[in-house]
C-alpha cells in the first residue's frame, strides 16, 4: 500500500513479521496429535523467487493460516531442494564452489519468503545438500539395496552432452527428446549405472492410483500412461541364423493374429541384429546410419536370418526395423500386416505378404490388402482356431503353443539414479577388485563430498585422495563410486524429514511420521506428475514394506497450481521481457497486495495473466478495509430491532458461511469475492444516518478474520485497530451467528426485486422517484404453489381440488394454469411471512439507490389492481413520481 491513511506497508509488514516470529506463532510442537500437514513442493535454490513461486507458496500459506484459525494444529514447513547441476554450473561460471553459491541463494530466498509473510515453522527447515540430510539418502540406498531393490548394470542411458550427465526417462521431454534442464537433444550412451527397481512396484503404483481420490484426474492419467501396463503373451520364435538357431521371445497383445505373421522384426540394437550387421554391410549401414525410431515411416532391412512361425510352422523373413525398440517389449516382434497399421505400411513398402486371419463379426467385409483390420473379431484362415472370437483365440493359442505364456509389459522402466556430476549425494559404494561393489557401512555414513574441483567431466573422478579408500569387507584397496544420486532421490522423502528434522539416528521418527503423515494437502506444478510425484509414491511404498511407515501413499490431496502469465497472456520469461519481479511488487505495494492479487485472480489450478490494474485494485481493497477498521467503534452494541441492520447482519453471517466453504475447497478467489462484496455492503450501510455501529463493527471484525489468511499483515493492523485480543492469525475462525440456510433464496428475491424496480424506473423514464411500494402476493397463492409442488402431473386438478382454493374461483384457476405451464420448474418462493420480512430488511437498499422511501405491503394492504399483479417470489411494484 501507499502512504495513504498512515499505512506504511514496509514498516508494518516487517513489524508484524517480527511479532509473529517472537511469539512462535507458526511452530508446531513435537507432541502435536496429527496436525494438519500442509506442504508446497520445496523450491530449487535458484536464489530468486518469481511470481509462480509467490502464487504456489501463497496458496499453502493461506490454507495453513485458515486451518490454524479454524482450530487445527498445523505443520507448514519449508526447506531447500539444494543439490543439482545448475548450482554446479553457477559455481563454475563464478569461480566459486557450489556450496557457497547454494548457501548464498538460500539466504536470499529465505529473506524473500519472510518478506512475503509466509508462516513457516523455520525450526523444521531442511536443506538437502546438508550432510545431516543426505546421509539418510545414503542410508536409504543401503536399505533399498539390502531389500533387493538396487542393482548395477551396464545400460544404454539417456545422455545430455551439454550437462554431461545421465537423465532418467522422465527427464527426457517431448518428441524431440530434449533435456529437461537445458533443451539439448539427448543421445544414448552405454554406462555402468545404479538403478532403483521401480518396476517391482509397477502393479501397485498403477492399481493404487484409483485410490488417489484427492488428486487431479489429469495427474492420475499421466501416471497411468507412464506406467503403461499392457497385458498380452510372450511366445518363442525359433530364429535360424548362419551361425545356428536361437529361440527369441516376442511379446504381443494380439496372439489371435499369429497365423497372419508374415515376417519377424528385431530392434537395431538386438544382439542378433548386431551379429547380422557384422555379416552384412547393408544391415550395418542401416543400423548405423538409417534407422530412425522417430521417423514418420517405418524402415528396415532384411537379414540372412529366418524365423519359424510356431503356429503355422512356416519360415518367414527376419528384418531389422527401426520401429522395434529394445526397451519396449522384448526388442523383437511378430509382424502381422493384415491387422496392424505399422506392419501393414512396412509390408507394402517391402512387398511382403498381407494375410487376413481375423474378420469382423456379422456380415461386414474388409479388404486387408487396402487397409488393416485392427479390431477384435472372429478368427479365419487360422486352421483349427477358425470361428473362435479373438479373446477365445488368444486364450487357446496361449495354452497350445509350446513355450507361450501370458505376460504383462510395462512402459515404466527402473529408475536410473546415477549422475556423473559433483553436486549431489555420493552413492555409498566402494569398488573392490576382490569383493566387487560393497556398500559403505551405516556407521561410516555420511560419505561427504570432497572439496570442489574445477574440471571437465565428473569432478569426483578428479578427487584422487577422496576417491581411493579401503574396502569395508576385506580392508584392501578400493575406489569410491564417483557417481552421485539423481536429485529426485532427495525430494522423494523430504516430507518425512520435516516431522523430525534434527533426528540424528534415523531419517525420521517412525512413530511421529505415522501419526502426522500422509501430507493432507500438497501443492506444486503438474510438470512433476511422472517424476517427483511418482518417485515419492515409490519411496513411500518401499518404506512401508521396510516397516518404517504404516501408510503407502505420501499425499492425501494434491493441487497442481496454474501459471502466472504475462500481461500478454503468454508464459513469463526473461527473453520476452514480460516477467514481473515479486520484490518490486512487494516494495511498491506490499506483500499483502501481491498475495491478495495472485489468490483472487483465479482458482489455484487455473492460469491467469498478470494485471497491473488487478494489483492496484487489490491494493485499494486492503486500504478500504483498513479505513473501515480504523473508523468503527469496536465496543458498539447491536440493535436487533432495526430491519436494515438485521439485513446487514444476515449478509455478514452468510458471507462467513460462503467464505468458509470456499476456503475448504481452496477457492480463495471466491472467498475474496464474498468478502469484497460484504465490505462494499458495509461501506454503503455505514453511510446511512441511522446505521447501527454495532452491526458495522461486527461486519468489519468478520471481514478482517476472513481475509487474514490471505492478507495477514493488513489484517493484523486492522485487528489492532479493532482492539482485538492477541493476533488475528491466532483468532478463532468466525461462525455464522444466524441461520443462513435460506440465504440463496432470499438473495435471489432481493436482487430480482431490485432489478424489477430498476426496470420500471428505466422503462417509465422516471427521473426522480418519490416512493416505491412493494406488494407481496396474497397468502392463498402460496398455498396453491405448495399444493402444486405435490401434484403428480395434474397441477390444475390438484390445485382446484382444494376446497378453499375453489372458492377463489377464476383467480385460483388462472393461477393454477400458470403453475401448470411452469411445471416442473415451479417458483422457489419463500413462505409469505419470510418473504415479506426479507423484503422489509432489504428495503433500505432500494431507498439508498433511488433516494426514495420504500413500503413493503401485504396484498390486503395495497390497491387491488396492484396486488393482483403479485405472485409468490415476485412482488408487485409501483414507483411513485412527482
Question: Which residues does each PLM region occupy?
Answer:
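Alpha-helical recognition segments enriched in aromatics with Gly/Pro capping
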Residues: 199, 305-328, 467-606
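Residue patterns forming the tRNA-binding/recognition surfaces of aminoacyl-tRNA synthetases
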Residues: 22, 95-248, 332-444, 459, ...
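Non-catalytic terminal extensions that flank enzyme cores
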Residues: 1-51, 193, 203-206, 217-228, ...
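Acidic, turn-prone loop/beta-hairpin segments
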Residues: 81, 429-431, 642-657, 673-677, ...
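Catalytic adenosine-cofactor/nucleotide-binding cores of aminoacyl-tRNA synthetases and other
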Residues: 348-350, 354, 579-649, 819, ...
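C-terminal low-complexity, glycine/proline- and small-hydrophobic-enriched intrinsically disordered tails
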Residues: 728-882
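N-terminal catalytic cores of NTP/NDP-binding nucleotidyl/phosphoryl-transfer enzymes
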Residues: 19, 23, 27-103, 124-140, ...
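Catalytic alpha/beta core of large soluble enzyme barrels
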Residues: 60-61, 70-73, 267-361, 366, ...
Amino acid at each position: 500500500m501507499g502512504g495513504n491513511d498512515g499505512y506504511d506497508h514496509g514498516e508494518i509488514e516487517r513489524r508484524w513479521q517480527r511479532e509473529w516470529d517472537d511469539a512462535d506463532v507458526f511452530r508446531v510442537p513435537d507432541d502435536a496429535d496429527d496436525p494438519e500437514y500442509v506442504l508446497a513442493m520445496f523450491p530449487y535454490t535458484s536464489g530468486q523467487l518469481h511470481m509462480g513461486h509467490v502464487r504456489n507458496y501463497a496458496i499453502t500459506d493461506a490454507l495453513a493460516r485458515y486451518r490454524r484459525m479454524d482450530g487445527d494444529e498445523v505443520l507448514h514447513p519449508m526447506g531447500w531442494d539444494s543439490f543439482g547441476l545448475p548450482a554446479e554450473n553457477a559455481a563454475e561460471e563464478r569461480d566459486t564452489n557450489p556450496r557457497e553459491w547454494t548457501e548464498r541463494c538460500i539466504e536470499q530466498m529465505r529473506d524473500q519468503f519472510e518478506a512475503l509473510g509466509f508462516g513457516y515453522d523455520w525450526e523444521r527447515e531442511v536443506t538437502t545438500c546438508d550432510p545431516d540430510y543426505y546421509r539418510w539418502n545414503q542410508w536409504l540406498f543401503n536399505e533399498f539395496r539390502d531389500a533387493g531393490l538396487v542393482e548395477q548394470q551396464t545400460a544404454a542411458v539417456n545422455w545430455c552432452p551439454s550437462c554431461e550427465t545421465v537423465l532418467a526417462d522422465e527427464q527426457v521431454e517431448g518428441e524431440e527428446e530434449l533435456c529437461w534442464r537445458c533443451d539439448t537433444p539427448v543421445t544414448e550412451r552405454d554406462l555402468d549405472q545404479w538403478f532403483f527397481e521401480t518396476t517391482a512396484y509397477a502393479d501397485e503404483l498403477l492399481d493404487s492410483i484409483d485410490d488417489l481420490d484427492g488428486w487431479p484426474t489429469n495427474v492420475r492419467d499421466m501416471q497411468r500412461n507412464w506406467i503403461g501396463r499392457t497385458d498380452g503373451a510372450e511366445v518363442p520364435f525359433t530364429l535360424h541364423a548362419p551361425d545356428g538357431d536361437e529361440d527369441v521371445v516376442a511379446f504381443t497383445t494380439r496372439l489371435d493374429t499369429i497365423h497372419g505373421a508374415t515376417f519377424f522384426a528385431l530392434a537395431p540394437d538386438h544382439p542378433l541384429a548386431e551379429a547380422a550387421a557384422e555379416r552384412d554391410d547393408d544391415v550395418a549401414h542401416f543400423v548405423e546410419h538409417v534407422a530412425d525410431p522417430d521417423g514418420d515411416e517405418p524402415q528396415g532391412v532384411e537379414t540372412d536370418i529366418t524365423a519359424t512361425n510356431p503356429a503355422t510352422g512356416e519360415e518367414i523373413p527376419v528384418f531389422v526395423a527401426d520401429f522395434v525398440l529394445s526397451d519396449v517389449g522384448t526388442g523383437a516382434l511378430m509382424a502381422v500386416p493384415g491387422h496392424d497399421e505399422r506392419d501393414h505400411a512396412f509390408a507394402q513398402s517391402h512387398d511382403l505378404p498381407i494375410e487376413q486371419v481375423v474378420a469382423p463379426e456379422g456380415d461386414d467385409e474388409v479388404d486387408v490388402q487396402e487397409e488393416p483390420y485392427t479390431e477384435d473379431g472372429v478368427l479365419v484362415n487360422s486352421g483349427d482356431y477358425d470361428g473362435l472370437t479373438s479373446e477365445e483365440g488368444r486364450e487357446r493359442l496361449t495354452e497350445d503353443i509350446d513355450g507361450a505364456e501370458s505376460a504383462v509389459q510395462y512402459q515404466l522402466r527402473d529408475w536410473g539414479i546415477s549422475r556423473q556430476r559433483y553436486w549431489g549425494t555420493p552413492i555409498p559404494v566402494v569398488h573392490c577388485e576382490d569383493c566387487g561393489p560393497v556398500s559403505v557401512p551405516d556407521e561410516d555414513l555420511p560419505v561427504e563430498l570432497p572439496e570442489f574441483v574445477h574440471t571437465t567431466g565428473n569432478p569426483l573422478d578428479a578427487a584422487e585422495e577422496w576417491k581411493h579408500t579401503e574396502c569395508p569387507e576385506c580392508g584392501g584397496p578400493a575406489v569410491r563410486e564417483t557417481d552421485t544420486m539423481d536429485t529426485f532421490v532427495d525430494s522423494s522423502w523430504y516430507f518425512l524429514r520435516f516431522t523430525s528434522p534434527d533426528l540424528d539416528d534415523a531419517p525420521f521418527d517412525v512413530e511421529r511420521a505415522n501419526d502426522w503423515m500422509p501430507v493432507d494437502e500438497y501443492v506444486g506444478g503438474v510438470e512433476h506428475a511422472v517424476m517427483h510425484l511418482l518417485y515419492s509414491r515409490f519411496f513411500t511404498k518401499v518404506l512401508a514394506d521396510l516397516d518404517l511407515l504404516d501408510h503407502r501413499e505420501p499425499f492425501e490431496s494434491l493441487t497442481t497450481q496454474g501459471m502466472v502469465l504475462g500481461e500478454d497472456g503468454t508464459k513469463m520469461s526473461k527473453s520476452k521481457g514480460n516477467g514481473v519481479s515479486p520484490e518490486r511488487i512487494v516494495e511498491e505495494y506490499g506483500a499483502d497486495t501481491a498475495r491478495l492479487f495472485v489468490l483472487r485472480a483465479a482458482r489455484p489450478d487455473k492460469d491467469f495473466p498478470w494485471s497491473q490494474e488487478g494489483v492496484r485494485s487489490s491494493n485499494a481493497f486492503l486500504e478500504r478495509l483498513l479505513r473501515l477498521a480504523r473508523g468503527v467503534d469496536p465496543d458498539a452494541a447491536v440493535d436487533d430491532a432495526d430491519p436494515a441492520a438485521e439485513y446487514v447482519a444476515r449478509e455478514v453471517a452468510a458471507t462467513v458461511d460462503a467464505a468458509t466453504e470456499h476456503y475448504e475447497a481452496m477457492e480463495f478467489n471466491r472467498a475474496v469475492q464474498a468478502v469484497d462484496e460484504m465490505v462494499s455492503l458495509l461501506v454503503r450501510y455505514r453511510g446511512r444516518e441511522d446505521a447501527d455501529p454495532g452491526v458495522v463493527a461486527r461486519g468489519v471484525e468478520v471481514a478482517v478474520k476472513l481475509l487474514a489468511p490471505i492478507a495477514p499483515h493488513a489484517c493484523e493492523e486492522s485487528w489492532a485497530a479493532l482492539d482485538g485480543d492477541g493476533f488475528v492469525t491466532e483468532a478463532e475462525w468466525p461462525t455464522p451467528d444466524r441461520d443462513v440456510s435460506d440465504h440463496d433464496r432470499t438473495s435471489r428475491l432481493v436482487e430480482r426485486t431490485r432489478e424489477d424496480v430498476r426496470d420500471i424506473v428505466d422503462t417509465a423514464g422516471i427521473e426522480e422517484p418519490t416512493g416505491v411500494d412493494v406488494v407481496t402476493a396474497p397468502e392463498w397463492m402460496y398455498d396453491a404453489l405448495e399444493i402444486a409442488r405435490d401434484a403428480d402431473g395434474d397441477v390444475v386438478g390438484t390445485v382446484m381440488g382444494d376446497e378453499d382454493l375453489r372458492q377463489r374461483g377464476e383467480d385460483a384457476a388462472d393461477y393454477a394454469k400458470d403453475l401448470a405451464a411452469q411445471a416442473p420448474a415451479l417458483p422457489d418462493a419463500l413462505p409469505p411471512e419470510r418473504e415479506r420480512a426479507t423484503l422489509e430488511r432489504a428495503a433500505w437498499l432500494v431507498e439508498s439507490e433511488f433516494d426514495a422511501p420504500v413500503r413493503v405491503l401485504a396484498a390486503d394492504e395495497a390497491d387491488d389492481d396492484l396486488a393482483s399483479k403479485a405472485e409468490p417470489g415476485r412482488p408487485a411494484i409501483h414507483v411513485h413520481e412527482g
